[in-house]
Amino acid sequence: MAEPQFAAPDPRDVDARAVRRAFGRAATTYDAAAVLQREVGARMMQRLDVVKLVPHAILDAGCGTGEAVGELSARYPGARVIGLDAALPMVNAARMRARRGNSLLRRLLSPLRAKADMAAPQFVCADVNALPLEGVAFDMVWSNLTLQWLNDLPRVFAEFRRTLKVGGLLTFTTLGPDTLKELRGAFARADGHTHVNRFVDMHDLGDMLVQSGFADPVMGMEQMTLTYADPRALLAELKAIGATNATRGRPRGLMGKARWQRMLAALERMRRDGRIPATFEVIYGHAWKGEPKRTPEGHPIVKLQRRPP
């Protein structure tokens, strides 16, 4: 009997355990360094201004330290907001932020009004690939700069759709292929290992949404460039937010002084106007959960309308 054949893991795939560890270690340094995440989150929030939806239940998938959870709670008073993250230290930091926010609100408002104006958010430590939220139906799923850390995006989109109500909104951001192209190029000059994540193209994401059953997907992209005084400042900021090399093909030992110096020298040659640039291709997407077209068993649903007499 022939031995079963198993596909070798792709070295460009993300190691989920390494991601959890990195973000767990970064829980205490994340807020001070998350410049890009905060700016992109603010732009996401602005895009909600034109959305005609008053959600009663919201999921923040990949909530990190919980900044967006508080902003969504303030934007939609009375809504049930659940923050979910795979890294327990991040979830604990988000809980602490929520407690501080609720305490401040109660000092500013009368206790009865504060309780009526803003429901306390809830937090869950779990994997976005398998949401442990049976029986919970959301009007909105929000996810800011999380999807780039996940390998099986069709599965993730299917989970989001499963937990949304009909007519519910998925709104998300992620990073596209040009992200950290300077750092990727510098490492390529130093050695042959994978050092930067693989990022999915905007058009492929739109196709995945349609294939997952979402309706009316809208995709957009913009490039943002952050600049740094030197290469070490860039690397230190990435480490502070947990964005370290978590690919399966990452080197397990130290890089070596000679190769490290080659990488730093390659980044130095990219210096413009005295600063080291780092490009981020930010992808924005939203889509809606429409009426189901098939039963859970896979049978097509045909709606019949009664003719007027």
What label would you give each PLM region?
Residues 1-28, 42:
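N-terminal, positively charged/glycine-rich alpha-helical extensions of SAM-dependent methyltransferases
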Residues 36-56, 67-71:
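Conserved alpha-helix/loop element of class I SAM-dependent methyltransferases that forms part
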Residues 57-131:
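Class I SAM-dependent methyltransferase SAM/SAH-binding core
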Residues 129-141:
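A short acidic, Gly/Pro-enriched loop at the edge of an enzyme's catalytic core
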Residues 139-152:
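A short SAM/SAH-binding and catalytic strip from SAM-dependent methyltransferases
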Residues 154-166:
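A short glycine-rich, Lys/Arg-flanked "PGG" loop and its adjoining helix->strand segment in the class I
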Residues 169-233, 240-254:
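Conserved catalytic/acceptor-binding region of the Class I
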Residues 236-309:
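C-terminal lobe and adjacent flexible extensions of AdoMet/dcAdoMet transferase-like proteins
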